Amino acid sequence: MTMSTNNCESMTSYFTNSYMGADMHHGHYPGNGVTDLDAQQMHHYSQNPNHQGNMPYPRFPPYDRMPYYNGQGMDQQQQQHQGYSRPDSPSSQVGGVMPQAQTNGLPTGGQLVAQQQQQQPQQQSQTPQQQQAQQPQQQQQQLQQLPQVTQQVTHPQQQQQQQQQQQQPVVYASCKLQAAVGVGLGMVPEGGSPPLVDQMTGHHMNAQMSLPHHMGHPQAQLGYTDVGVPDVTEVHQNHHNMGMYGQQQTGVPPVGAPPQAMMHQGQGPPQMHQGHLPGQHTPPSQNPNSQSSGMPSPLYPWMRSQFGKCQERKRGRQTYTRYQTLELEKEFHFNRYLTRRRRIEIAHALCLTERQIKIWFQNRRMKWKKENKTKGEPGSGGEGDEITPPNSPQ
């Protein structure tokens, strides 16, 4: 154990002698544990919260969260107004000091960077005990700095580039920067997404991301009308009106419409909102005989009832008029068998079909044969040749 402790002390002394003073070898710090680093931070981070009142309002851009996306405008104001606090920047948490232009006797950015480089190996060479002793101090500093306004950290190289960009036209590195600056100037970005507002927190940001999926719910509390973007309620009303207009175009029938209108809707555009309209969706399978007064639909053969008086017509029996019967009897008296040519002529003359003419003549011959059988059977053999001649065309 003694060898290990001696080795640890020798290694500790090796690192601490080269980078630390004698009073800081074993974790003993002067005063209240505040190092020179905190004294340097006092130049840059003012502990007076009322000091922020010196900043002009409105700032550019007029949003507190915009410095996360655009650090150029805030750096210009920091060069003009010294002492404006940058509380929870990473440089204050890790022990670095943010560079600042040399004004009113303050150190320049190059000197602060050199001091930061000297202090970084000191922090690396500290033992775990010393780091644990510094942790509560750093946590207290962070708690004091949290209530102040959050801003973005810029390094010396970025500051030099931003000074060059002041003379040159601004070129944005990403679309988010351009959208954020455009909203700050009062322009609406191409995507149509509303800007970030002062009171907007992470919950409101999530609600903003899910806004297109919940257009039906008005979200006027987000304050989108301040920047010239139309209100969500107006968008919802326009969406509702367009939906009603689309329903009128699709041909959804009114409540009292007959079922015939439902039958002819297949010729129009597809009905998208028909199933979502209660009271207007009538089943197309209603019986046409029970329809209300209005346009009477034509009675097709497949619509006729299979029972009742219409059952006799199912046999297809044709009723001939007295004129048609008289003309057919005349033709049968002169010729009991018809040729095809004569059959066509009679069909056109009597407004009948060839099949009807053929069937009538067949029935008439059978009737005539029965009449001859009943009159005298001895003469039926001689009359048989007249009934069915051998060369009669059928």
Curated annotation (Swiss-Prot):
Pfam families for the chain: Homeodomain (PF00046)
Ranges for region Disordered: 44-135, 256-300, 368-394
Residue interval(s) of motif Antp-type hexapeptide: 299-304
GO molecular function: DNA binding; DNA-binding transcription factor activity, RNA polymerase II-specific; RNA polymerase II cis-regulatory region sequence-specific DNA binding
Keyword terms: Developmental protein, DNA-binding, Homeobox, Nucleus, Repeat
DNA bind region: 313-372
Record-stated family: Belongs to the Antp homeobox family.
Record's protein name: Homeotic protein antennapedia
Originating species: Drosophila subobscura
